[in-house]
């Protein structure tokens, strides 16, 4: 599925999804959890029950699947402002799931070597566990062939830093862990955990910061319901992070531009 997701974005179809654990899956815990993990960093997760004989609820296979899937579903809900901002970019043609060469064009990314990894927006590098490489009986595995472009990259779950411009092999991926890296300097708009977008606190701004020199991002929002965005009803907020010569971090959230019905000022 991973090359299909990448190819869909390159073909002008950014809102791609597929059945969690396969349409007739539902018996293999490891496949189930790995699917929930990487599809957290995709536009949509389609978990449809009733087509096959097996239940497809996120908790249907018991533990540890229930807890691990819950963790990733929670994270997906928290990343909604980040995803929504890049969904706005997709209106103009730049996909949410990006082939590596879209962000980092070079001889290596122009070939097929990075077809099993991708960028989620500009800041997350996702390298799914798509096959059994060296898995033990509990499903703990490794991932080979992770290409990190030039620059510094941070393991999203541990905070460990990696220098880019190289390929990483034998990257530890215990059962709970998706190999995902965030670009140093990233500013990630987030929100409160929620079961439905109606539960999002629009008056709360959360930014996950990875200060490195001077960086900035743009957060986009609108009413999330109507097509009023086509008439310009939406808002943008510029957020800057600057590391001073004294190694102090100055964060600037600029005044939001625009308006829409229901916007919380």
Where are these regions (language model features)?
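Catalytic-domain carbohydrate-binding cleft regions of carbohydrate-active enzymes
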Residues: 1-177, 183
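Accessory, solvent-exposed terminal regions and/or long lumenal/extracellular loops of proteins
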Residues: 177-265
